[in-house]
Amino acid sequence: MFRIVKWLIALPVGIFIFFNAYVYGNIITYRAVAPHRTAFMSMRMKQFEQEGRDVALDYRWVPYNRISVNLKKALIASEDARFAGHGGFDWGGIQNAIRRNRNSGKVKAGGSTISQQLAKNLFLNESRSYIRKGEEAAITAMMEAVTDKDRIFELYLNSIEWHYGVFGAEAASRYFYQIPAAKLSKQQAAKLTARVPAPLYYADHPKSKRLRNKTNIVLRRMGSAELPESDTD
């Protein structure tokens, strides 16, 4: 009986250690090499296949300096205003999310920073639980410890979902505006950013009033967005 209990404890611990060793190895690799495909991309494409949708993956990596500063500012203004200064976690946002989750009785709000969103996109699935949030936090901490802010942001910009099968700034820019990501205007960047929280909803509801309102909010906030110190755009 004791041996069974020991195995029941050792097995999940071993899986946790193995998975995090795998993740850490990939984080080190991604400091210099672009991901071939993220876990979220794979999950989403499998979902489309199961739903019978004929969707092809459109994912085009471009370096950080070939992405418009307008899009960088728009995303920081909308998704993580403290990105340049925090260590991966916005503690005020996390406390607010915990409060909202407690009031609703389930995990709905995440309080996720850009770094946390990237951790999820690269390695995790879409499930909402405190266990997954804990794993997301562990990955975020590892990533922030060994990766500079520009690279984290570069990975994020290239892995965001924007439409059915459309991932990353370059693919989105060409899909919506037929231009490279480097040439996005403020208005275009704000419109793209407004889609980020619910890209598939807005793909099906492109004339949503909520999308227009969010675009205007992003435009107003862009001027105060603080980019990482090493940004030279």
From Swiss-Prot:
Bilayer disposition of the protein: Single-pass membrane protein
UniProt keyword annotations, A-Z: Cell inner membrane, Cell membrane, Cell shape, Cell wall biogenesis/degradation, Glycosyltransferase, Membrane, Peptidoglycan synthesis, Transferase, Transmembrane, Transmembrane helix
SUPFAM superfamilies, sorted: Lysozyme-like
Keyword Membrane set for record: yes
GO MF terms held by the record: pentosyltransferase activity; peptidoglycan glycosyltransferase activity
Enzyme class, first EC level, given as a word: transferase
Record's subcellular location: Cell inner membrane
Domain of life: Bacteria
Annotated EC: 2.4.99.28
A GO BP entry: peptidoglycan biosynthetic process
Catalytic activity field: [GlcNAc-(1->4)-Mur2Ac(oyl-L-Ala-gamma-D-Glu-L-Lys-D-Ala-D-Ala)](n)-di-trans,octa-cis-undecaprenyl diphosphate + beta-D-GlcNAc-(1->4)-Mur2Ac(oyl-L-Ala-gamma-D-Glu-L-Lys-D-Ala-D-Ala)-di-trans,octa-cis-undecaprenyl diphosphate = [GlcNAc-(1->4)-Mur2Ac(oyl-L-Ala-gamma-D-Glu-L-Lys-D-Ala-D-Ala)](n+1)-di-trans,octa-cis-undecaprenyl diphosphate + di-trans,octa-cis-undecaprenyl diphosphate + H(+)
Broad class of the protein's primary localization: membrane
GO cellular component, one term: plasma membrane
Pfam families xref list: Transgly (PF00912)
Segments passing through the bilayer: 8-28
Associated pathway: Cell wall biogenesis; peptidoglycan biosynthesis
The family this protein is said to belong to: Belongs to the glycosyltransferase 51 family.
Function: Peptidoglycan polymerase that catalyzes glycan chain elongation from lipid-linked precursors.
Protein name (database record): Biosynthetic peptidoglycan transglycosylase
Gene responsible for this protein: mtgA
